[in-house]
């Protein structure tokens, strides 16, 4: 199966996804990115710790075989393979180690911890089990813990050290290995007078495995939205094998066979029973029913459908059997596009993550340096300057007396080396680059998933962060603030031509156009039962109009300046109506007056934005009087309107606003909005808009409702706040815990950490970041119920 390769506009530039297994912290991410960026031909790299994916842009002329990328990653000690499928509906959400295996390792570690602790408890209760109070027994338990449940962690840590890319696992290896080796030396050479603490590796690995198991479960829950989307795609369907030989009226009862959805092709006929989900985008050829389309449109009520209606994959058939002719299947369906958009959004990094990446890239080296300095200081100067610390057992530290096999709270008065080693180990294991690495991607993962549930498709974490900072919203008028469903209210002939013929010419010029004004003219011609006529040499100029030839006449249809009748005396109409002018080479022929209505939610959305301190403007190609009339209906001042603007001027207007220091969000739907959408800091397109507008936007509102703008803005601000909370926690944790573990508070307050307690703190730190990101779901849903609905 070919790898999932996407070619860009540049024929030599290619993007590919690489699945990377074994990354545990931001240090791992930094190591993979650094190694790939050093590979000749690689142009850009983005690695996501949560999804375990690396997106690599490379020059295909320099890298003919992309497997060299996986070889580079494997050289760091990680498992890597090219993603083998580009259909987002058939892909796993993330390469997460099987929880069943992880739980088994945790269970073994917990058993070893209980047995180890039982030896101590039995001694305290004067009922020790035979042998459990002996050093060799605890040495055996520690060995089992290292070679059993802790083996994968230690192997990954060693690979990182060996390849010059130390990571979180490397810190655990150094910490547990140091404790184990020191205890082993004390056991084998008791004459040295060292003490043993074999329990520390057992307790440390137990806490780390517990934290990672809980963390993986939390990560899995953080992808709930993507899981829900994937669940909408059925695995099998009922395929009609010979539909061409079946009469249309018999299709509903025709025999069908179970068929994998992944093998469906355009043109196939499928039967969809009540209670089944539709597997393809297509057209109903037999039957009528009701559909649950809430997944795509947000409409809570069932929608009726009949022959000729188009349906989308993932929608639920509620009442009667349907036969559907497939038009788009697999990765071409609208559902697949939504899943792909969400997955790509979760892969793209937010700018705020660069800060965490800059720290995490060298974090492990810094921790190792601090641990070495801690050991050297307390083994020499520290114990001399503050000898009283040698009389204080570290809280929670249980040490074995080497000569008697008995446990005791052992003072450190004769062993500065033991104190130094214990504190150095604590430094190694308390440090948490995982929290730094998880702070941003987990929040983005949850936020983009929540957005998808609300019908908001976000292109990436960078878009989400930028939207949170927006304070200036610019709306297109037609089809955005208005419903885009124009009605022809008057034809005003300005030459001796029959009005019906004028309408036929206008409809012919606008044939095949999706613009709302064009649709209104075509609808009016059909309603008048006017026969369609052909137009030749049609040429559309976005934002101005269309030209062509009808009945031998060279015609222009559009705004008055473009049809070159600016010097003519133009008739006036309703201030709220929109005019389209028709002219030939000689004269102005007609004026068509059309009227649109504001969206029902438009006024409330505009006022809600303004009440929260945002500036709202209207940017329209329509005439000034029409745009101002709409603004007044929405409660806006006429000064907020910029009208009669060409598409390129829209982009210039957005650029001018942003040059004043304002980050601007542009909301539009048409071809003429595409330049402005691309120029704005955040472009927002409605689902009913043109493909060009959607491609130019950073956000797509698939439910085609303006109140989704409010929802997206609110969610982006909550997401950015969660990211800042996570980063503050991750940085604050390390700033506080590293000095505590290094013994900075030991002389004055007698406070320090044992390695086991340090390991528990490290596990809790990562879990806290993931849990805080998951809380975003709760706070967001609560906000929907209280302040966002309009």
Curated annotation (Swiss-Prot):
PROSITE patterns: ATPASE_E1_E2 (PS00154), HMA_1 (PS01047), HMA_2 (PS50846). GO terms for biological process: copper ion homeostasis. Residues 1-105, 157-163, 220-358, 439-723, 775-790 are cytoplasmic. One of its GO terms (cellular component) is plasma membrane. The keyword Transmembrane helix applies. Cu(+) binds at residues 25, 28. Mg(2+) binds at residues 669, 673. Residues 14-81 form the HMA domain. Involved in copper transport. PANTHER family: ATP7, ISOFORM B, P-TYPE CU(+) TRANSPORTER. NCBIfam families: ATPase-IB_hvy, ATPase_P-type. Belongs to the cation transport ATPase (P-type) (TC 3.A.3) family. Type IB subfamily. This is Probable copper-transporting ATPase SynA. It comes from Synechococcus elongatus (strain ATCC 33912 / PCC 7942 / FACHB-805). The lineage of its organism: Bacteria, Bacillati, Cyanobacteriota, Cyanophyceae, Synechococcales.
């Amino acid at each position: 199966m070919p790898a999932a390769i996407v070619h860009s506009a540049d024929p030599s530039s290619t993007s590919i996804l690489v699945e990377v297994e074994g990354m545990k912290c931001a240090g791992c991410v930094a190591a993979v990115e650094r190694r790939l960026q050093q590979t000749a031909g690689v142009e850009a790299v983005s690695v996501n710790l949560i999804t375990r994916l690396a997106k690599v842009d490379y020059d295909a002329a320099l890298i003919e075989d992309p497997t060299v990328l996986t070889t580079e990653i494997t050289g760091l000690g990680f498992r890597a393979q090219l993603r083998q499928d580009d259909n987002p509906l058939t892909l796993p959400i993330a390469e997460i180690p099987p929880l069943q295996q992880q739980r088994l390792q945790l269970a073994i570690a917990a058993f070893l911890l209980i047995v180890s602790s039982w030896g101590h408890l039995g001694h305290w209760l004067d009922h020790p089990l035979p042998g459990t109070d002996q050093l060799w027994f605890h040495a055996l338990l520690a060995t089992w813990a290292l070679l059993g449940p802790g083996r994968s962690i230690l192997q990954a840590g060693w690979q990182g050290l060996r390849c010059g890319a130390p990571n979180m696992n490397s810190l655990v290896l150094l910490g547990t290995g140091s404790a184990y080796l020191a205890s082993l030396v004390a056991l084998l050479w008791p004459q040295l007078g060292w003490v043993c603490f074999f329990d520390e590796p057992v307790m440390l690995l137990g806490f780390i495995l517990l934290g990672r198991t809980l963390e993986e479960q939390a990560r899995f829950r953080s992808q709930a939205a993507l899981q829900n989307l994937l669940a909408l795609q059925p695995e099998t369907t009922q395929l009609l094998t010979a539909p061409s030989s079946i009469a249309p009226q018999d299709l509903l009862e025709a025999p069908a066979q179970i068929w994998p959805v992944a093998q469906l092709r355009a043109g196939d006929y499928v039967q969809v029973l009540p209670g089944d989900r539709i597997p393809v985008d297509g057209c109903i050829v037999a039957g009528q029913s009701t559909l649950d389309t809430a997944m795509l449109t947000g409409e809570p009520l069932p929608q009726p459908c009949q022959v000729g209606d188009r349906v989308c994959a993932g929608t639920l058939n509620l009442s009667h059997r349907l036969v559907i002719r497939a038009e788009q299947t697999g990765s071409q369906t609208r559902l697949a596009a939504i899943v792909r958009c969400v997955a790509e959004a979760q892969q793209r990094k937010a700018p705020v993550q660069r800060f965490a990446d800059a720290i995490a890239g060298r974090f492990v080296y810094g921790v190792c340096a601090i641990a070495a300095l801690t050991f050297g200081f307390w083994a020499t100067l520290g114990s001399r300057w503050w000898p009283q610390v040698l009389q204080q057992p570290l809280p929670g530290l249980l040490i074995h007396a080497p000569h008697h096999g008995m446990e005791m709270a052992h003072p450190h008065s004769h062993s500065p080396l033991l104190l130094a080693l214990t504190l150095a180990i604590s430094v190694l294991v308390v440090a948490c680059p995982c929290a730094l690495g998880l702070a941003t991607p987990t929040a983005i993962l949850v936020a983009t998933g929540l957005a998808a549930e609300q019908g908001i498709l976000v292109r990436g974490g960078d878009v989400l962060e930028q939207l949170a900072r927006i304070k200036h919203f610019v709306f297109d008028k037609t089809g955005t603030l208005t419903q885009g469903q124009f009605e022809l209210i008057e034809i005003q002939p300005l030459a001796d031509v029959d009005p019906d013929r004028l309408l036929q010419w206008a409809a012919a010029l606008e044939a095949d156009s999706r613009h709302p004004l064009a649709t209104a003219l075509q609808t009016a011609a059909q309603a008048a039962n006017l026969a369609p006529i052909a137009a030749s040499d049609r040429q559309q100029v976005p934002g101005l109009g269309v030209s062509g030839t009808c009945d031998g006449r060279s015609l222009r249809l559009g705004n008055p300046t473009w049809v070159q009748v600016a010097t003519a005396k133009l008739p006036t109409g309703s201030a709220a109506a929109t005019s389209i002018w028709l002219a030939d080479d000689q004269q102005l022929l007609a004026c068509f007056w059309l009227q649109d209505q504001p969206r029902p939610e438009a006024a409330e959305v505009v006022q809600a934005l303004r009440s929260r301190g945002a500036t709202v403007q209207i940017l329209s190609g329509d005439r000034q009087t029409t745009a101002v009339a709409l603004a007044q209906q929405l409660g806006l001042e006429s000064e907020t309107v910029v009208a009669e603007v060409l598409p390129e001027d829209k982009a210039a207007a957005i650029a001018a606003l942003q040059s004043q220091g304002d980050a601007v969000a542009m909301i539009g739907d048409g071809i003429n909005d595409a330049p402005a959408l691309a120029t704005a800091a955040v472009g927002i397109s409605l689902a009913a808009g043109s493909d060009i507008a959607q491609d130019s936007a950073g956000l797509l509102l698939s439910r085609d409702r303006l109140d989704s703008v409010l929802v997206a803005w609110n969610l982006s601000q909550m997401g950015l706040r969660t990211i800042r909370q996570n980063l503050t926690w991750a940085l604050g944790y390390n700033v506080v815990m590293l000095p505590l573990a290094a013994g900075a508070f030991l002389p004055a307050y007698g406070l320090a950490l044992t390695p086991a307690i340090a390991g528990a703190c490290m596990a809790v730190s990562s879990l806290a970041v993931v849990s805080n990101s998951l809380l975003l779901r709760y706070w967001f849903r609560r906000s929907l119920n209280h302040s966002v609905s309009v």
